[in-house]
Amino acid sequence: MKESFYIEGMTCTACSSGIERSLGRKSFVKKIEVNLLNKSANIEFDENQTNLDEIFKLIEKLGYSPKKTLTKEKKEFFSPNVKLALAVVFMLFVVYLSMGAMLSPSLLPESLLTINNHSNFLNACLQLIGALIVMHLGRDFYIQGFKALWHRQPNMSSLIAIGTSAALISSLWQLYFVYTNQWSYGHYYFESVCVILMFVMVGKRIENVSKDKALDAMQALMKNTPKTALKMQNNQQIEVLVDSIVVGDILKVLPGSAIAVDGEIIEGEGELDESMLSGEALPVYKKVGDKVFSGTFNSHTSFLMKATQNNKNSTLSQIIEMIHNAQSSKAEISRLADKVSSVFVPSVIAIAILAFVVWLIIAPKPDFWWNFGIALEVFVSVLVISCPCALGLATPMSILVANQKASSLGLFFKDAKSLEKARLVNTIVFDKTGTLTNGKPVVKSVHSKIELLELLSLASSIEKSSEHVIAKGVVEYAKERNAPLKEMSEIKVKTGFGISAKVDYQGAKEIIKVGNSEFFNPINTLEIEENGILVFVGRAISEKEDELLGVFVLEDLPKKGVKEHIAQIKDLGINTLLLSGDNRENVKKCTLELGIDDYISNAKPQDKLNKIKELKEKGQIVMMVGDGLNDAPSLAMSDVAVVMAKGSDVSVQAADIVSFNNDIKSVYSAIKLSQATIKNIKENLFWAFCYNSVFIPLACGVLYKANIMLSPAIAGLAMSLSSVSVVLNSQRLRNFKIKDH
């Protein structure tokens, strides 16, 4: 059984990887992925051994709060920005008290300047008050950090909590000696506590703002979903809930309103804003017979539409589900960071303790408290400067921003692995009709051995039951010439060949067949000299003999810009192959015209499937680009499946990438975005590993002989900057652009 839910209380990748590691050890858990950024978890488990409630209990034992839905954050008295501002104010107050005299004696009043028990104690008490206020403002670090430590799942908050608490306790200890007149003054770390917390809070705030902006893509789409729609019933408008709409309902769409579910216009016309699908800002003109999609907006004029999907299966629902899955899933490249994070925090705590002991022993002065002070500073610096956040943010932040960028390009990735794998593709297999071409073949000529209107009537009656684009071309042609439709029975579809049905022909019920040449065993011939898509119409005389009645010649022109985009793809060193069920002449012509490397014509669904298998067996990483029902098996077999927007539901389910702008440029964009994303992730990981590899030894004091020691305050600043640098580098993907060929 597969389940998705949310986990609250996670602060860094040590949290998410700890949950994965703990549950992954259970025999009944087959697979688990926890995403830190959107707090989601996907788990696959054996329902015969456990249930979701038991899994929730296991997660709660680790110190986290699993929930089926995210709860709204409780409104606090201070907003995050106000809390941050107050932390900065009180931090400056404490720094002023602790360091003002060193900077300039005139900065402090005389009562706090003289070094004697009374003035030093008063100064320290004021620092303590300021530090406690800052700690209260940053209390989440202590609540989450010590909670995680108690459950033996230490995280970033644990490092901050231990380090600042150690500094506070040491300061309180020294303050006690001053208060009891055993010491004349103490060496306090109140300003270090404040500066560390302030820097960490600033870093976290920047992280959260950036994360929220990246997550806005799905939130914006969800806002496009109307709660109600106008349903026509007995010639009256009735406002109904969108969830109650069923296929076949007639809906009225008013100007300025969103389309509730997918459907087809049956009366009127409109201009629709489909930018949430295609990324294109210009409105799209729609008329009777055109499809409309949920979540798009009607600019002006009202129209009637017939629902072809319910809310659950609508285009918008599928997009939201894809974005959620993409944001919740993990790329393979993140596994390295997860493995390191699983031992990172415990290792840092061990290193900090070891460094403390070593410095306590080898510190250069014989004074114990002097040595203790140096050792404590090293201990706190090591804990604070270590940054599992930079490591944990490296991959998911880039994936999050990349998915947001993809949606603006009309692209949607099924999961992070699809985004990661697209860059590795070295062979692309294209379907022709509707993928490279406009997908709307038009009849350019008809050759008939019977009365033309009768042929049109027979063909359109049978083809009307098909969703194939070629069939629609025939139906449209017949409709324009007012050919009457006939009643049918015993409809049979032979996938990849054609359709047959019993139809009234010359006063008798005859089996009429409509399809390609291989669908027939003709006893007669039709001389056709022109090239194009041939659709034959015939009468079945027996099981093995057919009489040809006529043929439609259609043409499907290539989409605008396809040739240039295929050239861009080939410039990446990728092999291209056209795999089509069309005849050899048409496929060859299309291949030469568009500059595709090779082609296979007259390919049936099984032929396409076999070719994909063959390419994969040769070690090729294959991307299949298609849009029709016949493509579904091949799409599922390919390494990366790309579906053009208006494909059938079956094809969309098999897709790794969906292009809602129905443009081959999307294929090139997906590959380039994949390359840019992985490059960005590698930059983030390189920085995160280098940062920790360099700064942890520095915090330990390895360059003490060169008079280089990092104070806890500087360590806090460095830690915050490391996370912020990863976030800012990930944001560079927002500026990703596709260069025109």
Regions found by a protein language model. Name each.
Residues 1-122, 236, 316-317, 321-329, ...:
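Flexible metal-binding regulatory segments at protein termini and peripheral loops
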Residues 78-228, 339, 446, 464, ...:
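Transmembrane helix-loop-helix hairpins at the membrane interface
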Residues 443-574, 584, 596-611:
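P-type ATPase nucleotide-binding
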